[in-house]
Amino acid sequence: MVIISHKKNTVNNLRHSKELLLLCSSMLLIACSSAPARTGTVTSVSGDNRAPTTATIKANSQVAKQLNLNDQQDFTDARRGLIASPKDLKIPSSKDASKNVWNMSAYDFIEGGAPATVNPSLWRQAQLNNIQGLFEVTPGIYQVRGFDLSNMTLIKGDSGWIIIDTMTSKETARYAYDFAMQHLAKRYPNTTNVSAILFTHSHVDHFGGVLGIVSQQDIERKKIPIIAPAGFIEEATSENIIAGNAMLRRAVYMYGKDLARDEFGHIDTGLGKSPAFGEVSITKPTVLIDRTPTKLNIDGVKFEFQYTPESEAPAELTFYLPEYKAFGGAELVSRNMHNLYTLRGAKVRDALKWSGYIEEARNIFGDADIYFGSHHWPMWGQDNIQKFLKQQRDTYKFIHDQSVRRMNKGMTPGEIAEDITLPTSLSQEFYNREYYGTVKHNARAVYQGYLGWYDGNPAH
């Protein structure tokens, strides 16, 4: 067992109060801002431009023929264990109640068959991400899904609730937690307190809502453990302060923040609906996980941690709950192809390490009968989980290896991106589809990771 007190690393890790203040201020700006020169506007397509072109119709038709869109297993899994679902889910801003930081009702149009304007595979993913509410993964483990881009997972401890990831904003986290307690209190009377918080990684949609569910004073007074991967504060700081303004502008564009929510505009981001643009917070970890395996007993629940730095996030972990035979995969795996390079801008992710961590998880947590993650819906059955992990492992490894092979032959990033396609054994799986990351973008990322931006052309 390795437990590292954050107090021992105060000066080096945080530069403490100043840096946290800067971080929170920066993230608040990021969360509350919108695209330059278009503040408060929504961009919609109108007139003759609304009709899909012949090329679009043909391309979407080809996708429909390639995939088994009648496969309902994902829908069965996404609805499994539903306890309650809110009606007309809108979460107001804490700063201006007339504005919403989250509006799931805007996506009510996503039903039935895919319209001609939308890729049918993406439409299917959007329908799945529309399934919202409080769900029982297994007795003792619950998830709130569809209240933010990411999930909040609640694990019943001896004295309270262990919270895994606290969403993007204080508003969405508070709303999600209150909704969960409203229904879970019937099963677990007099248990509405937070006994521990775990951040799986250093991206804001997994920690930004923390002070919405518990105050800093309560964290300190009640000595609530805050568990995170080593490097968490440093990476959250570097991403949101140093490059925050540039990332914001690009994130607004990448996520289509100002697009109208309709079949001609915004329907989904693959990973979820969209980020919540609300008030963001952070708190200092008290326990850092820096090696595999690390075993902790958290409020009576046994955790086995896998430390996975420089994978989907610079600082990340996954965990296994042996008493439940449940694998908490964080964002190491998800039900879409992830990105090795995010268009909002970030450090390039190492596909080789990433695929290696998935293989490691597959081996050390091979008894898992349940998988749940920081996004999307769970999976049940050891064989299903093993196949899922193998397929995701092979997807990132294939993109890495084939990009490197072409790179060493002298091909440019653009040439590599156009030349690589996933084999059908991988591409036919819905959880490997290019809803969020793409093969073209990821191939360029592999090149950038090894050789940088220069493509070998003297004119450049």
Regions found by a protein language model. Give the residues of each.
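Bacterial N-terminal signal peptides that target proteins for export
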Residues: H6-L21
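C-terminal motif of bacterial Sec signal peptides marking the signal peptidase cleavage site
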Residues: I30-A31
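N-terminal pre-domain segments of enzymes
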Residues: R38-A126, N130, I358
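Divalent-metal (often Zn2+) His-rich catalytic cores of metallo-beta-lactamase-fold enzymes
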Residues: V45-A64, K295, A326, N336, ...
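Conserved beta-strand hairpin/beta-sheet module of binuclear metal-dependent hydrolase folds
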Residues: Q127-R187, L317-Y320, K325-E331
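Metallo-beta-lactamase
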Residues: E136, I227, I233-P309, K353-F365
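Active-site metal-binding motif and surrounding structural segment of the metallo-beta-lactamase
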Residues: S159-G160, E171-P225
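Active-site neighborhood of phospho(di)ester-bond hydrolases with catalytic His/Asp-centered motifs
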Residues: I164-T166, N193-D205, I227-P229, F327-A330, ...
